[in-house]
Amino acid sequence: METMLKSNPQMQQRNNHSGQETSLWSSGFGMKMEAITPFLGKYRPFMGRCCQTCTPKSWESLFHRSIMDLGFCNVILVKEENTRFRGWLVRRLCYFLWSLEQHIPTSSDASQMIMENTGVQNILLGKVPGAAGEGQAPDLVKKEVQRILGHIQTTPRPFLLRLFSWALLWFLNRLFLNVQLHKGQMKMVHKAAQEGSPLVFLSTHKSLLDGFLLPFVLFSQGLGVLRVALDSRTCSPALRALLRKLGGLFLPPEANLSLDSSEGILARAVVRATVEQLLTSGQPLLIFLEEAPGYPGPRLSALGQAWLGLVVQAVQAGIVPDATLVPVATAYDLVPDAPCNMTHDLAPLGLWTGALAIFRRLCNCWGCNRRVCVRVHLAQPFSLQEYTINARSCWGSRQTLEHLLQPIVLGECSVVPDTEKEQEWTPPTSLLLALKEEDQLLVRRLSRHVLSASVASSAVMSTAIMATLLLLKHQKGVVLSQLLGEFSWLTEETLLRGFDVGFSGQLRCLAQHTLSLLRAHVVLLRVHQGDLVVVPRPGPGLTHLARLSMELLPTFLSEAVGACAVRGLLAGRVPPEGPWELQGIELLSQNELYRQILLLLHLLPQDLLLPQPCQSSYCYCQEVLDRLIQCGLLVAEETPGSRPACDTGRQHLSAKLLWKPSGDFTDSESDDFEEPGGRCFRLSQQSRCPDFFLFLCRLLSPILKAFAQAATFLHLGQLPDSEVGYSEKLLQFLQACAQEEGIFECADPNLAISAIWTFKDLGVLQQIPSPTGPQLHLSPTFASRDNQDKLEQFIRQFICS
C-alpha cells in the first residue's frame, strides 16, 4: 500500500486530484458493490432496558417482547395522510396544517400556584430565618418573587408553539435526511405516561440543537409541550426570552449564591416551587445530564444534577408520589453544530447569530446530498421511587485514587485495595448543596446511572464505524473494496454485542453516504483496475476522526479494557514487537488478569467508563474476562494439578468471601470456592486474533497516550500555574508531539483536562490557594524525576504500539 501511494503516477494524481475527486464523489465511485444485510437477517437488538438490580419492578412492568417488532418511524416525514385534509393544496401546506392540528394543552395560571406554594409563603411571611423576606414588606418580597419567576419561566404561547413547530419541521427536513424513532420505545413511554406519574426525560447532549429537536419529537408523538431545562450560558438574554415562551426553563443567577445568602434562599425556594408545580400538573420535563457541547470540562452537567436534585427532593418530600424517569439519547451521523475550535468557551447564542447560522446552514444544504441521519433513543422508563429504595443498598465504602493507585505506581505496594474508587469531577451547585448529604450522593449516582443507560442505548452511526476503521487500522490508506468488507465486519461485531446501528441499505450507498460526510477529512484516489484508495487527511482530520470513533468505544469498552490489561501483563515478559506466537506461550492467571484490569479501571476516568454505581469493580472484572473469552482472544488452559473446567464436584468454601454491596448475580459459583492458583489462560492462536487484539488496544490509545505525554510534560517544569494556564500549555505540548510523531488523535483539549484532573486525584498535582487564585503545584511525592518516570512507565505498560 505504501509503495502504491508513493509511486509517481499517484503523486501526480494527488497534486491535481481536486477535479477528479469531485467527480469521484458525485459518480458514486463507479463501482458495482454487493448488498449488505447489517441486521444479521431479521435480528435487530432492542436496547435500553432499565437496570434489573435497581429497578426490577419497572424492568418487568413497562416492557413486552411484542414491542421489539414495531419498527421505526421518520418523525419529520409529514405528508398529506398526517392531516385531516386531502388535495393538491394540502400536499403543499401539510407542514402548516399538521402544526395547526397538534394538541396543545391549556396551561393554568402557574404563577399563582407557585405564589401559593408553602415554601414561598413561608418566605413571604418572614418565617424562614435568613431569607430575603425576613424583616421586609411582603409586597416588596412578592415583587422579587415575581421577578425571579419571570427569569425562570413564562406561560407557553400556543400561537408561537405552532409557528415554531412548523418552521422547525421545515428546517429539519432540509437539514436531515431523516430522524428515526423506534415505535416500540415510544409505546413504552406512552404506557408509562398512562400510569399517572410525571415524566422526566434525562438526555445526553450531543448538540445545541437537541434542545429543539427532542421537544419537537416528543411533541409530535402526542406527549404535549415539554418544559426544557436550558443553560443560560448558551443563550443571549433576547434568545432566553423567546425560549421561555416556547417552554424553556432557566435557573436564576441568584440560585447559585451561597447557602446563607438571603437572595439565594429566596431564589432556590422559587425554583423548588416551580419544579413542584410542573410535577403536580403532570407536565413532562427534559433535563440534559451532559454538559453543553463545546465546553471542555466534566462530562456530567452540574446544571443537570441541580434540576434532577429538585425532582428527587419533590418525590422525597411527598409532593408527588413518584416520578417516571426516561433516559434519552440522540445519535447523529455528524453533529450539525460541532465546534471547530474547542480550546475556548463558546459565546452565547443570540437571535441574530442564531438566524445567521441557520441561513448559512440552509445555504450549505441547498442542492446538496450530504444531509445527515439522526436517531432518537428512548430507553425503558423506570420509577424514581423504586430506584431510591433499592439503590441505597448498593452503596459501599469508597476511596480516592491517591489511596488506591499511588502506592502501586510508586512500587510501594502490590495489592489493590478491596474498595471502589471515589471520583467526582462535576462541581456541585448551591441547589445541590442545599440537599441533605445522603440525597446529594443519591442524585450524583442516579445521574451517572441514567447517563450510562442513555449511552448504552444509543445506536452506532455509520460515520463512527468508518472513522474507527480509518483511524485505528488504515491511517496510511486502504483500498475501498477492503474498507467495505471491514465495514461490514465491524457492523456485525457491533450487533453481536447487543448494540444497534443507525443505518441500513446497500453497502455501496452506505459507503458513498458516509465518505461524502467525511470528505473534509479523507481523500479519494483512483488506482489501477478501477479501484479507489481512501486516505485520511493528516493533522486536524485525524483529531476529528478520533472524536467520531469515541462513539464506538462503549460497544467494545469491556474488550478494550481487557486487551490493554493483557498488554500490561505481558509488557514485562515479552517484547511488544515480539511475534504473536511468542506472546501466546505465556500463561496468564486469573488473579493476575483481575489485578491488571482493576489497575486500568482505576486509572481511566469514570467520565469515560461510565460504570453503573450498582456494579462493583470485581463484577466488572469478571465481565471483562468473560468478554475476552467470548470473543476468542483468551482460551482456558488447565495447568497440571488443577481441577478440570468440567469438574462440578464439591469444593471447599473460600476462607475469604468478597461480598459486594451490589450483589453478584453471575451464573458462575466459582467465586465462592477455592481454586488453587485460580484459572489460567493463554492468548488464542487463531489467525484473526492479532489484528483484533491490536484493534481493541488502539481504541483506548488516545486517552492513554495523552496521559503518558502528560506525565512526560511534568519533566519540563511548567508548574506552578493556574489550571487553565497549565491545560493550555499541556494542549500545546500535545499538539507539538502530534506534529512530531503523527499522533494527532491525542491533541484534544478534553483529553488534556482529563489528564490534569486524573493527576490531581492521583496526588501528582496539588491545588494550593494563592492571592491570584488557586495554583497547581507538583506534589512533593512526584517532585523527583524517578517517581515521574515510574508514573509514565505505569501508564505506558497499557499502550500497544
Swiss-Prot record:
GO biological process: CDP-diacylglycerol biosynthetic process; glycerol-3-phosphate metabolic process; glycerophospholipid metabolic process; phosphatidic acid biosynthetic process; piRNA processing; triglyceride biosynthetic process
Enzyme Commission numbers on file: 2.3.1.15, 2.3.1.51
Sequence ranges on the Cytoplasmic membrane side: 1-305, 473-795
Principal location listed in the UniProt entry: mitochondrion
Regions that span the bilayer: 306-332, 450-472
Membrane topology: Multi-pass membrane protein
Mitochondrial intermembrane face of the membrane: 333-449
Catalytic activity: sn-glycerol 3-phosphate + an acyl-CoA = a 1-acyl-sn-glycero-3-phosphate + CoA; a 1-acyl-sn-glycero-3-phosphate + an acyl-CoA = a 1,2-diacyl-sn-glycero-3-phosphate + CoA; 1-(9Z-octadecenoyl)-sn-glycero-3-phosphate + (9Z)-octadecenoyl-CoA = 1,2-di-(9Z-octadecenoyl)-sn-glycero-3-phosphate + CoA; 1-(9Z-octadecenoyl)-sn-glycero-3-phosphate + (5Z,8Z,11Z,14Z)-eicosatetraenoyl-CoA = 1-(9Z)-octadecenoyl-2-(5Z,8Z,11Z,14Z)-eicosatetraenoyl-sn-glycero-3-phosphate + CoA
Keyword tags: Acyltransferase, Membrane, Mitochondrion, Mitochondrion outer membrane, Transferase, Transmembrane, Transmembrane helix
Family: Belongs to the GPAT/DAPAT family.
Record protein name field: Glycerol-3-phosphate acyltransferase 2, mitochondrial
Source organism of this protein record: Rattus norvegicus
Biological classification of the source: Eukaryota, Metazoa, Chordata, Craniata, Vertebrata
